């Protein structure tokens, strides 16, 4: 149902009885004029066809009544008759639904056909005034086919009776209508102005005609009048305008100034309106939209673009080089062209209490000047100098919002400057005495009662150690505690003279010596320990005579003989004992033959070396030393004895035969046991001696020649 039709029904209630009295005589005429438009589908029930026949005389009566008024109001009865027909159709639909079970789709189609038949019935009564739009609509309606036949559903309901015990009661909201608010509240509303009234009974949406009228009112009419208070010029003015005014007033919540649209404009708009059924039929005659063809993905080709490379471009001003010379910052220079140093910012000095009081009490009551007391006041750059007030003006009562000052008692005298008043006020204050406690350090007022307590650490005493973790005394097999090992008495320290005498014993035998005599065993042990612990003292001996040439080889032999003269070291009983490994390893030792360990593993080209050793050179280092001593004794005439060469500076005696004869005796007495600290040195000497023996024949050949 169109909203314009509903409004037309509401606005003209006085014309309803005229058009609502149908005559039975006109039923046959309407059926003869338009038999096509009243044809109902065959499948419809009987009661639906009866209702259609009943509506026909009403439509005819409406068309006749609409012809009587003048042409200006001819459009209104049409809309009214349509509204009544549609209203009548609506009233008969529930009755038809109660009589038989017909589908709601058939009823809607039936109502549409009835409403579309109304403008077609007015053809014979008014053929001359028919517009082209009406004829086009009639032709379009004729092209529509009959509705499809629907099979009747004759199944009867055999279930239990359906009952709806619920009842609905409508409760009206307070203040929705003018009659609902209490009388006292109405008085308050009447007293206050500018408050919008209550909303209307039912807010109906504006139709297209009302919207067009409201929008085109300002263009068509120049004179403005208040719609809320303007009286209607025509006595037959309908309630349609009032309803539009109420709707506009509710939306804008204020007074709206608009002019009523002219009647000619309204008539044209109503004539041009098309019904919904005609628009639906027109849209159905249009063809369906063809779907767009889908794109074939195989036809799409990928475009290969060159790979973009990132290049870093220097921006203007990023570096100092890119900034133009005109825009570069130039440092400030003096007359000589040297850059000026930045001036140090002067920090404002903190104000004292007296200065703060002076500044705060500046605008308060100023006493009369008695004598100008000059007191120097330190003023910083931050506090600007106060300008003198004009003579006629009074000092303001307050300078700060948070301070409340007393009213001024007297106006300042002529020529009075606020600085003088501040100085006078500051001079009246006593001088601040220095607090002796200012320089003292802050003492803690909180006294702690913590005391230091000595606590024994766990394990510090044997009592605090658990029995499982205490050290057990070493016991023997019988369970007796082992006696502590006797500490060896440390040997007496020897002076440098005693050591020199012990070392040079074999070289010189001085007649008058007061050195203590030690046993050979003790002396050898002491000497070996001292040599191992401390380095031997360096003695500077006089150089050999220039006419006797000495060879490095002879010096080495002399040193070897000197090392043999050292006493024997007492063997340590625990030295040869194997070290017991507490960690038991499961690794098994495998014996592998080393190259040269047996005669079979020696290559044939090295066999002659072994044969030479068997014949001449012994394999042990002891025999090598003995052989070296023999070779030294068998030197040809002209070669000097190495012992004589070394002991020449120490011994003043000319005879050297005794020392040469004593050396084999000492060697026979002392076995070839080398001290522990000289073990590595002996091995090194053996290797050097083997090289020297090979070079001995060459040296002998040179000496003989």
Swiss-Prot record:
GO molecular function: calcium-dependent cysteine-type endopeptidase inhibitor activity
Bias-annotated ranges (Acidic residues): 135-151, 355-364
Modified residues (Phosphoserine): 65, 202, 230, 352, 354, 361, 428, 504, 515, 563
Phosphothreonine modifications at: 115
Compositional bias of kind Polar residues: 275-286
Inhibitory domain repeats: 149-202, 292-344, 434-487, 571-624
Cross-link for Glycyl lysine isopeptide (Lys-Gly) (interchain with G-Cter in SUMO2), residue positions: 10
One Pfam short name: Calpain_inhib
Residue ranges, compositional bias (Basic and acidic residues): 7-17, 24-62, 173-194, 234-248, 289-317, 327-352, 365-381, 430-489, 571-625, 683-705
Top-level division of the source organism's lineage: Eukaryota
Cellular component terms per the entry's GO annotation: cytoplasm
Keyword terms: Acetylation, Isopeptide bond, Phosphoprotein, Protease inhibitor, Repeat, Thiol protease inhibitor, Ubl conjugation
N6-acetyllysine PTM positions: 28
Region Disordered, annotated ranges: 1-211, 226-493, 527-705
Record field: compositional bias (Low complexity): 63-72, 94-103, 533-542, 651-662
Domain text: Each of the four flexible inhibitory domains can inhibit one calcium-bound calpain molecule by occupying both sides of the active site.
Function statement: Specific inhibition of calpain (calcium-dependent cysteine protease). Plays a key role in postmortem tenderization of meat and have been proposed to be involved in muscle protein degradation in living tissue.
Entry similarity comment: Belongs to the protease inhibitor I27 (calpastatin) family.
Name by which UniProt lists this protein: Calpastatin
Species: Bos taurus
